[in-house]
């Protein structure tokens, strides 16, 4: 069994790693204004604070990390009324989350990750600025 | 005991042909018969527990005057849990009948009294459950009720559900809104609250780009929400996340309905009554156009589908994918939706005798997850 202290330590480590990734990962941007709202089959869409569009398979909705993500989005922005879902994180952080989810974590890792998400949200709050929606697109499978 | 079977009325026969059905998260009755014509009902669940409730009652509206016949329609959009909307569905119609029997007729006062007593009794339940189940104090519901009787339609509304009349006009149909709504994002509702609470600078707060009463709730009137009506419920053991930080003396929300009375004309084709989950995606005119231009059979489900298609478009996804999403997480894509379409015949269905009494409660059985 893991204790809370150890979990927090793990969470911190991940955040540091995420910060490292932030410097390395760059996104493919489509050059022209495309039909970015075309719906991909079997997917739901989440935008990030830096206006990147992510299309996830519907099965991600039953993942507890994603459910937490939606909950945080609701707390942060309220339920979306006239448009798509926006996550209170940037694309780098979301990209990192996806990688962890794809690796199929064990229960302890997942617990630590959920804690990490919550703390990351606190630090991201001050730098939250909704920018104009760009044409960046990202499909995750 | 042998039950008489030779007096099955038109309503009963119709119920057999078109029973109420459940298909996944959708509950529906495609077509039925009320005192003054046909009706269609449909509901869809988005929350982990369905918070919307609805009912249609047709037949005598008093216990002592058989000539007062009519149709009662209720749409109850709950929040914070299903208890308040279920309580209304169980109680408001018997109360309406009780008050109508006292004066042997339907009136605006009778309907308003039924609303007031339903709210009062729900708050009594909250008091009773306070030691063991304090979160009942944070449960509430909108309440939209329509009564069609004697050529008049009474629409009583507490909250932000909506009733819209479809009136035929030059080959088409015009939407006439019959309900007055109480939502902080309407200027009239804000003015009312500001004038009632002139010394409270935080009575209305903008949060997540929407106006909310005390920063917590969009509706400015409701049934239930005891913690916003009586200070005695705005304290422990109610969890802090459901409480207001400051003490109040005057009730913040009221249960008073806004009532409109409209004399029906031969041009009046139908009334759509629906929770805000529908009106979030369809305009009044779009909704009446769909009803006017489509077959009656399954019209409520058709409206539901039109709203869901719009919801899918806003979330940049396909309608077929939206329908795959499980309740609970589905609330991020759309709200619980209830829609009832009541067609209006200029003459009662049977001229020589009344149609069989009818009582349908929407939403049972419904999916539930913990």
Swiss-Prot record, chain A:
Single biological process term from Gene Ontology: auxin-activated signaling pathway
Specify where it is mainly localized.
membrane
| Annotated localization | Cell membrane
- Which InterPro entries does this UniProt record tie to the protein? SAUR_fam
Topology in the lipid bilayer is annotated as: Peripheral membrane protein
Q: Does the keyword Magnesium apply?
A: no
Going by the UniProt record, its keywords in alphabetical order are: Auxin signaling pathway, Cell membrane, Developmental protein, Growth regulation, Membrane
* Gene Ontology CC annotation, any one: plasma membrane
This molecule's function is given as: May promote auxin-stimulated organ elongation, such as hypocotyls, stamen filaments and petals.
Family assignment from sequence similarity:
Belongs to the ARG7 family.
Stored PANTHER family: AUXIN-RESPONSIVE FAMILY PROTEIN, AUXIN-RESPONSIVE PROTEIN SAUR61-RELATED
Q: What name is this protein filed under?
A: Auxin-responsive protein SAUR64
UniProtKB/Swiss-Prot annotation, chain B:
Listed under catalytic activity are: O-phospho-L-seryl-[protein] + H2O = L-seryl-[protein] + phosphate; O-phospho-L-threonyl-[protein] + H2O = L-threonyl-[protein] + phosphate
Which subcellular locations apply to this protein?
Cell membrane
Membrane topology classification? Peripheral membrane protein
Task: Tell me what happens on changing residue 276 to N.
Answer: Phosphatase-dead, unable to repress the plasma membrane H(+)-ATPase AHA2 activity
Q: What happens when the gene is disrupted?
A: Reduced apical hook maintenance in etiolated seedlings. The pp2c-d1 pp2c-d2 double mutant displays a long hypocotyl phenotype and strongly reduced apical hook maintenance in etiolated seedlings.
An annotated GO BP: negative regulation of leaf senescence
Q: Which Pfam families match?
A: PP2C
| Annotated binding of Mn(2+) 2, by residue | 77, 276, 335
Main subcellular localisation: membrane
All residue ranges annotated as the PPM-type phosphatase domain in the record: 35-344
Q: Which residue stretches, if any, does this entry annotate as coiled coil?
A: none
Q: Which InterPro entries does this entry report, sorted A to Z?
A: PP2C, PP2C_BS, PPM-type-like_dom_sf, PPM-type_phosphatase-like_dom
**Quaternary structure per UniProt?**
Interacts with SAUR19. Interacts with AHA2 at the plasma membrane.
Sequence similarity:
Belongs to the PP2C family.
What's the name of the protein? Probable protein phosphatase 2C 67
């Amino acid at each position: 069994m893991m204790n809370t202290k150890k979990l927090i330590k793990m969470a911190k480590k991940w955040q540091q790693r995420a910060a490292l990734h932030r410097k390395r990962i760059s996104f493919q941007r489509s050059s022209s204004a495309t039909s970015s709202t075309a719906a991909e089959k079997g997917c739901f869409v989440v935008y990030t604070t830096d206006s990147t569009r992510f299309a996830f398979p519907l099965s991600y909705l039953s993942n507890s990390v994603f459910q937490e993500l939606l909950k945080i989005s609701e707390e942060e922005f309220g339920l979306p009324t006239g448009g798509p879902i926006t996550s209170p994180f940037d694309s780098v952080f979301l990209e990192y989350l996806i990688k962890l989810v794809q690796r199929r974590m064990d229960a302890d890792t997942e617990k630590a990750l959920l804690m990490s998400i919550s703390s990351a949200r606190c630090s991201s709050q001050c730098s939250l600025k909704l920018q104009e929606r760009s044409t960046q697109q990202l499909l995750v499978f | 005991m042998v039950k008489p079977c030779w007096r099955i009325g038109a309503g009963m026969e119709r119920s057999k042909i078109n029973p109420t059905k459940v298909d996944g998260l959708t509950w529906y009755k495609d077509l039925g018969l009320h005192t003054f014509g046909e009706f269609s009902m449909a509901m869809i669940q988005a929350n982990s527990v369905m918070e919307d409730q609805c009912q249609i009652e047709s037949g005598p509206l008093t216990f002592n005057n058989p000539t007062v016949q009519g149709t009662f329609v209720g749409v109850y959009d709950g929040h914070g849990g299903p208890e308040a909307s279920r309580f209304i569905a169980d109680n408001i119609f018997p109360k309406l009948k009780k008050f109508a029997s006292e004066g042997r007729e339907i009136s605006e006062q009778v309907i308003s009294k039924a609303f007031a007593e339903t709210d009062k009794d729900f708050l009594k339940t909250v008091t009773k459950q306070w030691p063991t189940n304090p979160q009942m104090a944070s449960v509430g519901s909108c309440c939209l009720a329509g009564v069609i009787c004697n050529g008049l339609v009474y629409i009583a509304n507490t909250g932000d559900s909506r009733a819209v009349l479809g009136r035929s006009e030059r080959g088409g149909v015009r939407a006439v809104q019959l309900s007055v709504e109480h939502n902080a994002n309407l200027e009239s509702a804000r003015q009312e609250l500001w004038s009632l609470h002139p010394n409270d600078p935080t009575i209305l707060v903008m949060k997540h780009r929407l106006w909310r009463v005390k920063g917590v709730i969009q509706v400015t009137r409701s049934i239930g929400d005891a913690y916003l009506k009586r200070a005695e419920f705005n304290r422990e053991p109610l969890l802090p996340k459901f409480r207001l930080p400051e003490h109040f003396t005057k009730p913040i929300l009221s249960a008073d309905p806004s009532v409109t009375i409209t004399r029906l004309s031969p041009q009046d084709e139908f009334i759509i009554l629906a929770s805000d989950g529908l009106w979030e995606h369809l305009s009044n005119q779009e909704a009446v156009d769909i009803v006017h231009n489509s077959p009656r059979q399954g019209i409520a489900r058709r409206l539901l589908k039109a709203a869901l298609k719009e919801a899918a478009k806003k979330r940049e996804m396909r309608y077929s994918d939206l329908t795959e999403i499980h309740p609970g997480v589905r609330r991020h894509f759309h709200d619980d939706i209830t829609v009832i379409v009541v067609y209006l015949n200029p003459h009662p269905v049977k001229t020589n005798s009344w149609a069989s009494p009818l009582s349908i409660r929407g939403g049972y059985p419904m999916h539930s997850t913990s």
